[in-house]
Regions:
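Short, polar loop motifs at secondary-structure junctions
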Residues: 66-71
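Rhodanese-like catalytic fold shared by cysteine-dependent sulfurtransferases
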Residues: 2-7, 12, 17-54, 61, ...
């Protein structure tokens, strides 16, 4: 009988430790802010077609290619300017003086453009739109 009680106590103790461990793991997960009224600033992500629509309908925007200069020189979207993702840091970007300007951001595949968009938002830019990579671009490419 003592063995059964001892086993039950050990089982309860062990299960308490395990559930306590899991709750501390759950609490260590990063928080995701789902509040749409939050003051957290972010960028918009759109499809390639939506980007083309903006380019056809709007006139006051900048197309920002964040690839390396050698990639840019091999071919880019017409009228795009090149500011490599690696060059976007905590300093002002002379090519982008107006922080409220609509800026359409792309790279080769979409990874660097997302990263650059996040950096631009942190620098105070308020109208950043990321649309992926030139590998999906169906329009004209100039070099």
């Amino acid at each position: 009988m003592k063995k059964i009680i001892s086993l039950l106590l050990l089982t309860l103790l062990f299960s308490g430790c395990v559930s306590n461990h899991n709750s501390s793991l759950e609490n260590s997960e990063p928080e995701t802010n789902l509040d749409t009224n939050s003051s957290v600033k972010t960028y918009r992500q759109i499809t390639m077609k939506e980007a083309v629509d903006i380019m056809e309908q709007e006139s006051n925007y900048i197309i920002l290619d964040v690839r390396r200069p050698d990639e840019f020189s091999q071919g880019h979207i017409p009228n795009a300017i090149n500011v490599p993702n690696e060059n976007i840091d905590n300093t002002e970007i002379s090519e982008l003086p107006n922080k409220e300007q609509l800026i359409l951001v792309y790279c080769r595949s979409g990874r660097r453009s997302k990263e650059a968009s996040q950096k631009l938002v942190k620098l105070g830019y308020t109208n950043i739109v990321e649309f992926g990579g030139i590998i999906d671009w169906k329009g004209e490419i100039v070099s």
